[in-house]
Regions:
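Charged, non-catalytic interaction/linker regions at domain boundaries
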Residues: 1-177
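Amphipathic, oligomerization/interface secondary-structure segments
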Residues: 151-274
């Protein structure tokens, strides 16, 4: 899998070996490469402010090429068939590879202690490719055979609703709830396989939700979902306690997912009342 993103993702250009645990055989290699923009100024070349010309052409930005390479070999006879199947199962193929790329980005965020480094989604990519070739070929952006995928489709409702909500937030017609932000962080952690972090985030999100959403209990839809959400408080608290001890059992991860879905439903019900 290979993507091209505008700007920098965080990790420095290089090759990063991914293992399940120390001393395990390499499973994947994440390659971060930079395609320097032709008009990009050198870092530190101009340290003083300058007058901005009206209507000036924006500077081009760097492009980061990120590649996830599986170390499992593919036979020559089965390579083309593998590619066709990978394209057909786009969601799974892209999702698994993107999780590895985001693991590298998340690792950089921790290593650099930089809270502003964020994961990426497929929708953010300027280009998405699936292909096969030798390790050196793929790392250098070349292939024996590849497919460039069209951008993922977004429903019109998904495009309009955030814009309307944003306008309401900025105009003071709506408020941002702490439980919303905590729920989003829990969703990101859960989707990226960070069950411990998701359980801890969700435990706080539920406490905030029970306090913040109480003001909308007059809405039957919100009240019903709040009551159902209370049923998940104990399982989430148990999962959060397990997270502090080291890890979650599969059933606890499922409990976190179920509770998070309930919280997301309650938040949607509140928005429907606006």
């Amino acid at each position: 899998m290979q993507w091209e993103f505008a700007g920098r993702l965080g990790p420095e250009a290089g090759r990063y070996v991914v293992r399940r645990y120390a001393w395990d055989d390499p499973r994947h290699v994440v390659v971060i490469g930079e395609l320097e923009a032709p008009r990009r100024r050198r870092l530190g070349a101009r340290r003083r402010p300058r007058a901005a010309a009206a209507g000036s052409v924006p500077d081009a930005v760097d492009v980061t090429r990120a590649t996830v390479i599986a170390t499992d070999p593919i036979t020559d006879d089965g390579a083309h068939r593998w590619l066709e199947e990978a394209v057909k199962e786009r969601e799974r193929t892209v999702g698994e590879a993107l999780a590895l790329l985001n693991r590298a980005i998340h690792g950089h965020r921790l290593a650099a202690a930089d809270p502003y480094v964020g994961e990426v989604s497929e929708a953010m990519a300027m280009a998405t490719r699936i292909g096969y070739g030798s390790g050196e070929q793929v790392a250098d952006g070349d292939w024996e055979e590849a497919r460039e995928l069209p951008p993922p489709e977004l429903k019109r409702s998904m495009l309009l609703t955030p814009q309307q909500r944003l306008a309401a937030l900025l105009a003071g017609r709506d408020v941002a709830l702490a439980c919303e932000d905590l729920a989003l962080r829990a969703r990101l952690d859960l989707d990226q396989g960070r069950g411990r972090e998701a359980a801890l985030q969700l435990s706080l999100a539920l406490d905030a939700a029970f306090a913040e959403l109480e003001g909308w209990r007059a809405s039957e839809a919100v009240a019903t979902r709040l009551d159902k959400l209370h049923e998940h408080r104990e399982p989430v608290a148990s999962a959060a306690a397990a997270a502090l001890q080291g890890g979650l059992q599969p059933e606890q991860t499922e409990a976190v997912e179920a509770a998070l879905q309930r919280l997301e439903a309650a938040l949607r019900a509140r928005l429907a009342e606006l």
